[in-house]
Amino acid sequence: MALSPEPSSRFLVPATMGSAMPELPGAPNASLNSSLASPTEPNSLEDLVATGTIGVVLSAMGVVGMAGNVYTLTVMCRFLHTSASMYVYVINLALADLLYLLSIPFIVATYVTKRWHFGDVGCRVLFSLDFLTMHASIFTLTLMSRERYAAVVRPLDTVQRSKGYRKVLALGTWLLALLLALPMMLAIRLVRRGHKSLCLPAWGQRTHRAYLTLLFGTSIVGPGVVIGLLYVRLARAYWLSQRSSFTQTRRLPNPRVLYLILGIVLLFWACFLPFWLWQLLAQYRGAPPLAPRSARIVNYLTTCLTYGNSCVNPFLYTLLTKNYRDYRQRSLHSRGTSGPVGVRSFPQGHTRCQLGSGRSVTSSSQQATETIALSQAVPGSLCV
């Protein structure tokens, strides 16, 4: 999140390649410290151009991203009365993006003035905010992928889950993200180094390296493995449904919804993986053999990529929810009129599924449209 001439984008890193002061690797925003020790003269033309360019780019991203996420939150709040999980999760994602983008003015102000103006509290809040929002986003995306998977292979379980259950899960993502960000919030502190103020963690470099490695696992590796497995199994379910000779019509979820969720996940990885590799390279291999100017450019690019993710996401959220609403409306319409082969229509507002064991489940149409009656995935079930 912060800017630095060293190989660090948002985390505190050991000062290298011309930095005037030693710094521990640290938290999101940490490169704000390094920006106070630019490898170019503070008033040089190169420094002014770099400062102006990055300030304009980040400010533009902030304005576009904040407007988009506020719009998304406004629209999604209108649908909170429904039982659809998608709306709860999109609100979670937009809120995380908005909180992350709100840090841009602090970064730009610090980089332009070469001074830290926000005290010890500012250090603790801004340096831990990245970890919090990063994890809240990827945990929510993992929940969304799990929900879509369950809608295909366990549709009746999905029907029976209430809106309150999904809100608890959404809240749980924030609590878990806060737990992971808490060590940085407690360890970071404002330190005077000569005439400058720096935000530095109180622990040593080994501890910090272990902490960053843990966060890389919880924000990239772990969720990546889970989401990858879910989509492999979803692809297998689709493949089996296409090859099946079963004559009863099966209602599969809108592939566009699944593709858009996967697209949001891939965008997250594309924007954050370079940043993480840049950080971990500095932790485990030391300063890369780059000139100060080159390291500064890489730092700018990785920083802009992470903010670019939150800037572009609202457009994907809009497409996602539009396709999801269209799918729900088509599902409700088809069930209320003719109904698919082998499925008997019921009065508007209810569907009834009979299990092979003789048990039955009745649910509201709002919840029913959330699920997929995939006979191949749920042996022994038949919608009547």
UniProtKB/Swiss-Prot annotation:
For this entry, the protein name equals Urotensin-2 receptor
Alphabetized Pfam families for the sequence: 7tm_1
What keywords is this UniProt entry annotated with? Cell membrane, Disulfide bond, G-protein coupled receptor, Glycoprotein, Membrane, Receptor, Transducer, Transmembrane, Transmembrane helix
Taxonomic classification: Eukaryota, Metazoa, Chordata, Craniata, Vertebrata
Residue ranges, Extracellular side: 1-54, 114-124, 187-209, 286-299
Transmembrane regions listed in the UniProt entry: 55-77, 88-113, 125-146, 168-186, 210-232, 260-285, 300-320
Cellular component terms per the entry's GO annotation:
plasma membrane
Compartments (UniProt record): Cell membrane
Which GO biological-process labels does this protein carry?
blood vessel diameter maintenance; neuropeptide signaling pathway; regulation of blood pressure
Q: What does this protein do?
A: High affinity receptor for urotensin-2 and urotensin-2B. The activity of this receptor is mediated by a G-protein that activate a phosphatidylinositol-calcium second messenger system.
Q: Which cysteines are joined by disulfide bonds?
A: 123-199
- Its predominant location is membrane
Member of which family?
Belongs to the G-protein coupled receptor 1 family.
Q: Which residues are glycosylated?
A: 29, 33
Q: Which PANTHER family match?
A: G-PROTEIN COUPLED RECEPTOR, UROTENSIN-2 RECEPTOR
Q: Name one GO molecular function term.
A: urotensin II receptor activity
Q: Which organism is it from?
A: Bos taurus
Membrane topology value: Multi-pass membrane protein
Give a brief account of the tissues where this protein occurs. Answer: Expressed in neural tissue, including sensory epithelia.
